[in-house]
């Protein structure tokens, strides 16, 4: 994200893709093996709205969609929350982790644990990175009992942005723009790992002028999958072509998603096809199109 923080945002100071390592097949795990991480998301209890939060910006937002990160900050500030952005934050470690570079991923994760060690919630405008914080750090540090305590704390304090706005801030948005037909793409991580795919829908449902249209590939992957799109470009390309065809076929005038990795792939395909349709992050759409009734109509 730009070094220039948003109003009230507190900046806390402090091209080659390697071949994936071979990993043992799941079938080779011992029969009595136990899962280190908690089960994937079920119903969870939510805290009261805090005065302060951390924002984890994500690599893709930092490099390709910095405006989405700034808009996420502004949405949180609009709800009266002070946003703290540790300047030394980097990657969540997922690219290395999913490529089999466990040791390298662990060191990246260890740095994030140190940066987000306070008691504040950690808000992440990405289901993918939030899933790494909330679930996969348990596996990375399964042999470090003392570190697992930090992991458990971080996991419990991690929220995807739409989830946090809806469940913790209890936002009530009012639509201020012209009526629009819109398609929502939910990432695989939000849908299958975090169980936050309905939160974006619920936020959009508050907006009387927004008609969310379903598309034929509503629950299917866009083909990004991080480094999967580079390692398996033919398969990824076929998947994103199916996705963009479905989005265009829905008749939507706008496309939104809560994950910028998906937007990177979807928008790249639109551009290659010569189509003018582009997707934007949910945070940017909400900031552009709403006022907040929960904070006295602040835009």
Model-derived features: where do they sit?
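Ser/Thr/Pro/Gly-rich low-complexity, intrinsically disordered segments
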Residues: 1-3
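Polybasic, lysine-rich low-complexity intrinsically disordered segments
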Residues: 14-17
